[in-house]
Amino acid sequence: MPQPTSSDVHVDAILSNMSVAYMQEAYAFVAGRAFPTVNVQKQTDKYFTYSQADFFRDQVQRRADGTESAGTGYSLSTATYNAEVYALHKDIGDQTRANADIPLNMDMDATRILSQQMLIRQEVQWAADSFTTGVWGTDATPSPLWDAASSTPIADIETAKNTVLTNTGYVPNTVIMSYKVFSALVDNSDIVDRIKYTSQESVTEELLARLFGVDRVLIMAATYNTAAEGATASYSLVGDKDVLVCYTPANPGLMVPSAGYNMVWTGVSAGLGTGAAVSRYRIEERKADRIEIEAAFDFKIVSSALGYFLSNCTS
């Protein structure tokens, strides 16, 4: 069966921009916000990592007159990333388009469902890569759990911050939690008692950030259907009952430490410079137009010591 050639496939800037805007407005998803994004020109490549141990030694010495100063240095190693390509399409048949009240809306609707599913794929992938045990410098479980009357979530977060600070020299500035954990904290006495005499605010991400002493709290509120197409829908939240306390900079840099980076390959966007692109092309033998979304990314943990993972925070 004939296939479209590369010259037939057109990355649609309008649909791509609409897809990017939709992704940016989907606040239930944290994958695109958890780590700084690094746009990369190559799908897979190496990057340098600096020795943390060398940077944190106390090697400055007194200098006697006429003598050399003490010397130091640092070692470099390399790590790799691989921005896997993910894609999905939706075909719009000519008969379906002809029967539509507003034909243009069919392209927009296709872009929306493709964008939604790309968001889900990114969120599920980020959770599998980064929101789990065994990948960060420290794993712990609060005791008591945070839905218990005697629990101390503020102290538990402070313990996490102190651990990361001791091991890296950086105070964590980000707390990422599942919606199940957030729901438990809304009625947690350790939280509520701190604000009941001083504020009429309800418990929000911003209020938790102030109580925890971090720049931001991100709530994982994305849900998805785990059942196969045609089966009875079965919905599940992406995040379970866990919390990640980590340090991430506002902007990536060559010598800027971060718990992780989102490596985004721009090669799929045909010059738009984004990590996701929407193409539209003709499938003549099917008498249909194909709308296709494609993205390439790798959620890369760069420094495991800059993360502290709290699992099973509620019962």
Name each model feature, range by range.
Residues A64-G66, S178, G213:
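Glycine-centered small-residue hotspots that permit tight backbone geometry or close packing
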Residues D94-T174, Y179-K196, T314-S315:
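Alpha-helical scaffold segments that mediate packing/assembly in large oligomeric complexes
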Residues K42-A64, I92-T111:
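Charged, low-complexity, helix/coiled-coil-prone segments
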Residues L76-A100:
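Short acidic, glycine/tyrosine-flanked loop/strand segments centered on an H-E-D-like triad
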Residues P2-R62, S77-E84, L145-S151, V192-S315:
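Sequence/fold signature of self-assembling virion shell proteins
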Residues T67-G71:
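Hydrophobic, aromatic-lined core segments that form the binding pocket/scaffold
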